[in-house]
């Protein structure tokens, strides 16, 4: 009886298992055939039985039903249904994009670049060589600023600021001077007081729709991007209401073991004594100062553990008046406490005083706000208004000491970038053959560093002379610009088309810079020293006597202008699988300066030149998902605003001098790239690039009489070449992103060398400044769609690169190869809430800088060595972690 029961039970179980089938399939876009990620698949009538398509668009759904109907839905697509039965094999569900009709205009209800699929589509359809990072990728990234996010893109490294945070982008090994930054396709000014490059750490990443890194320029783009261009595209108004908010907190592990140093920056006087007096030197009046003209409250320092980091953001977007008016507003705020610990073992050119230890404490208050409005008059006419404001306020203490002396710096900096753009897009004639767009721009960048104080301690007491210095600096950069483009499309037989496009732009830039510095001595004299612990315990208790006249005549007091006009003609020809883009751009530059206090030189000067910049781009579709690209283009790089000013700055080791005869750089650029997009969010790219720079700008030595100066100069020709590989591959729940860049460059400059007891000038060949020969990134992605869990582990490697250029042969400072590991994870709920966590710099690998073995260092004793050279310093930044909540609502 027992055997009969067991046999019956086994048969029943087997019968049941026969009906417990697993439905497998893919969801694809009906028009493009691309896989769709994140679509919900439900069996009709059983809402509790559902699945979500994975990273490759696939799904697996277990059911006991022998037949039924699958329903598939996703925002931006119409619901799709498909019948199944026990005989159904692997299914393919087609989904059609949802569209909104507006007076013959068809608007697809999807984000322009927010998803990985959209980012790959932009890369695939672009006419030139471009890499795109989507908002979704930035959201999942462990990073929260654009400067740190962008380093994960192919061919991009970043230059760090004094606290170790990423600040400037280096594209394909080309220094930051060789690329430019756009916001919504419009160039923005820089808050830097000498140069034109834009610090990317001022931008919070969460307000962006995508980042586009363009590596080959077309004729309708501004031509001064030898390395390329970084375009920060802000979020657009959605077709239906969207609301998102986030709040997170975190901490830097660096301050678990030590205190955070801060000072009372709120007590800083924003104007220098000279400015408060009305700048009397401009009117030949007395401008002497006394101790009463300076505050001491701002020099009060505190040692404490910092507050937790706070990061928050909010965005709202919707359309009104039947979809005609679109609104997108976003705001982001970050209050972060960062720092680094550094040990300087060897300082070239200085007497050995033992290891100098430096502790950096940096509080960052970062704010970003922007509003985008667009109004669709009809399907053919559209107006857009954009206003963006990016603000960074940074308070930093640098406390450096060795066995003999101590130097403390207290610095507060405020910089902002404001940009407002009005743009119109118009279409005319049948099938929109004729198109016109125009743009008006007003932008301003500003930076101020008031009362930047440095205090010098000798052992246990204040130095008697040169006890302190305090400086005020501020500068502004204002742009007014206009752009216009017009195009006409010709349709020919065999489905070929020709788009002729012409346009131009004009920008008027006005820049000014102010610098004022004061030196202080101890009023107590050499026989009555101010001893720590006896006469003072905090820096605001020191007695400091200013020298009567500060340095108000510094050459950093200057006004500059730049007027750029450009026109271009360009054609885009499409035939079958071939696309040809050819164009010619003409740019006219008038750049000049006026010194407020000229020194035995012309107080005014300017440079005028015109460049012809041809470009040709070929794109050939090898098959449906693979393309071969070839690009040639000529581009330029203009000197920095301060570099052509005939200034002289006295330094301890050598003097620095400007160069009014400095020429702009002209480069010829070649690109060859193979692209394969096996699926909508996957790619394989391999590309070669080659650049020949004529008159590249680097710093070298010149001799005038008995004096030697470090000055910006043109050094003949330089070559920069390399290879880039980019891979993205997704499986159902697992994905890989990887890229690798090899770059080789060479430039020959002048250096100092010893010939017996004589100092002579020689030439030496080296790579371009800031370039790493090897750069690699690897990200492992995990997506468990049904559980709502996504995770990412990211590693990056930056090879050895030139960190600081010496004026002596073989005495350059190199930064050793560096590995960084970061991770993030998030859990989403159906109610729209997501819990996330981010962790950075998990390995806490120190940054190591060293000088290769050379005659000046080979006989040094007592110094730690690396690969035979002398270690100059090590820096530690510590790990940081963050946890938070994100809420997202999208109207269906």
What are the residue ranges of the model-derived segments?
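A beta-strand signature from Gram-negative outer-membrane beta-barrel systems
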Residues: 93, 202-244
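C-terminal beta-signal and adjacent terminal beta-strands/loops
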Residues: 797-804, 827-892
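Short acidic/polar hinge/loop motifs at secondary-structure boundaries
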Residues: 60-62, 158, 186-215, 235, ...
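Outer-membrane beta-barrel signature, preferentially recognizing the C-terminal barrel domain
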Residues: 405-423, 552-565, 636-693, 703-730, ...
């Amino acid at each position: 009886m027992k055997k009969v029961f067991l046999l019956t039970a086994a048969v029943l179980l087997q019968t049941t298992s026969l009906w417990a089938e697993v439905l497998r399939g893919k969801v694809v876009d009906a028009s493009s055939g691309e896989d769709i990620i994140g679509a919900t698949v439900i069996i009709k009538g059983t809402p509790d039985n559902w699945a979500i398509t994975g990273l490759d668009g696939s799904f697996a759904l277990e059911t006991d039903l022998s037949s039924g109907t699958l329903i598939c839905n996703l925002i931006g697509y119409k619901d799709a249904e498909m019948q199944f039965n026990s005989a159904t094999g692997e299914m393919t569900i087609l989904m059609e994009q949802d569209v909104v009709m507006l007076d013959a205009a068809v608007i697809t209800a999807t984000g322009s670049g927010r998803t990985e699929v959209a980012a790959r589509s932009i890369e695939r359809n672009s006419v030139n060589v471009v890499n795109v990072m989507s908002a979704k990728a930035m959201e999942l990234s462990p990073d929260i600023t654009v400067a740190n996010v962008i380093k994960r893109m192919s061919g991009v490294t970043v230059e760090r600021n004094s606290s170790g945070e990423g600040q400037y982008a280096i594209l394909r090994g080309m220094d930051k001077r060789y690329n430019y930054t756009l916001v919504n396709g419009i160039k923005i000014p820089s808050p830097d007081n000498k140069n034109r490059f834009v610090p990317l750490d001022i931008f919070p990443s969460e307000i962006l729709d995508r980042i586009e890194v363009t590596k080959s320029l077309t004729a309708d783009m501004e031509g001064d991007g030898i390395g390329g261009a970084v375009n920060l595209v802000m979020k657009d108004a959605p077709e239906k209401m969207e609301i998102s908010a986030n709040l997170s907190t975190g901490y830097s592990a660096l301050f678990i073991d030590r205190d955070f140093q801060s000072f009372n920056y709120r007590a800083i006087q924003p104007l220098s004594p000279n400015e408060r007096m009305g700048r009397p030197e401009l009117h030949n009046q007395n401008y002497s100062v006394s101790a009463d003209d300076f505050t001491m409250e701002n020099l009060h320092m505190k040692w404490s553990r910092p507050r937790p980091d706070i990061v928050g953001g909010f965005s709202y977007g919707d359309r009104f008046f039947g979809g005609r008016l679109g609104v997108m507003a976003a705001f982001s705020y970050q209050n972060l406490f960062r720092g680094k610990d550094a040990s300087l073992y060897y300082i070239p050119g200085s007497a050995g005083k033992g290891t100098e230890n430096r502790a950096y404490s940096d509080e960052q208050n970062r704010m970003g706000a922007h509003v985008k409005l667009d109004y669709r008059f009809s399907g053919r006419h559209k107006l857009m208004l954009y206003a963006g404001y990016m603000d960074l306020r940074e308070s930093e203490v640098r406390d450096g000491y060795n066995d003999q002396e101590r130097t403390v710096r207290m610095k507060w900096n405020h910089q902002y970038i404001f940009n407002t753009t009005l743009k119109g897009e118009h279409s005319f004639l049948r099938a929109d053959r004729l198109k016109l767009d125009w743009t008006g721009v007003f932008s301003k960048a500003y930076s101020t560093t008031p009362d930047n104080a440095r205090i010098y301690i000798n052992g246990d007491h204040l130095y008697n002379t040169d006890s302190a210095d305090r400086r005020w600096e501020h500068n502004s950069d204002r742009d007014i610009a206009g752009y216009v483009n017009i195009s006409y499309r010709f349709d020919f037989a065999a489905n070929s088309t020709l788009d002729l496009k012409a346009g131009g732009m004009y920008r008027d830039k006005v820049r000014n810079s102010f610098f004022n510095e004061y030196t202080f001595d101890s009023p107590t004299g050499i026989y009555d020293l101010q001893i720590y612990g006896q006469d003072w315990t905090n820096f605001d208790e020191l007695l400091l006597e200013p020298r009567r006249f500060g340095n108000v005549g510094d050459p950093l007091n200057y006004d500059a202008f730049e007027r750029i006009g450009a026109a271009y003609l360009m054609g885009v020809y499409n035939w079958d699988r071939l696309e040809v883009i050819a164009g010619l751009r003409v740019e006219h530059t008038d750049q000049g300066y006026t010194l407020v206090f000229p020194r035995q030189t012309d107080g005014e000067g300017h440079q005028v030149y015109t460049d012809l910049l041809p470009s040709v781009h070929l794109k050939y579709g090898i098959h449906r998902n693979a393309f071969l690209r070839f690009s040639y283009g000529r581009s330029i790089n203009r000197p920095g605003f301060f570099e052509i000013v005939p200034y002289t700055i006295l330094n301890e080791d050598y003097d620095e001098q400007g160069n009014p005869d400095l020429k702009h750089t002209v480069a010829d650029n070649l690109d060859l790239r193979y692209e394969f997009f096996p699926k909508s969010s996957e790619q394989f790219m391999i590309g070669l690039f080659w650049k020949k720079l004529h008159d590249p700008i680097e710093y070298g030595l010149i001799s005038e009489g008995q004096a030697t100066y470090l000055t910006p100069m043109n050094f003949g020709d330089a070559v920069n070449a390399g290879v880039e590989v980019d891979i993205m591959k997704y499986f159902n729940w697992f994905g890989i992103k990887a890229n690798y860049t090899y770059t080789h460059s060479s430039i020959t400059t002048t250096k100092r060398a010893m010939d017996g007891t004589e100092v002579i000038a020689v030439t030496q060949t080296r790579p371009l400044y800031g370039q790493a020969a090897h750069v690699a990134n690897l990200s492992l992605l995990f997506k468990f769609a049904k559980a709502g869990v996504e995770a990412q582990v990211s590693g990056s490697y930056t090879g050895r690169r030139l960190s600081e250029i010496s004026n002596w042969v073989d005495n350059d400072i190199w930064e050793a190869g560096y590995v960084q590991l970061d991770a993030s994870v998030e859990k989403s709920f159906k109610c729209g809430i997501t819990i996330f966590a981010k962790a950075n710099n998990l390995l806490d690998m120190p940054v190591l800088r060293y000088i290769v073995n050379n005659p000046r260092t080979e006989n040094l004793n007592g110094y730690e060595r690396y690969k035979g050279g002398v270690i100059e310093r090590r820096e530690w930044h510590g790990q940081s972690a963050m946890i938070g909540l994100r809420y997202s609502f999208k109207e269906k």
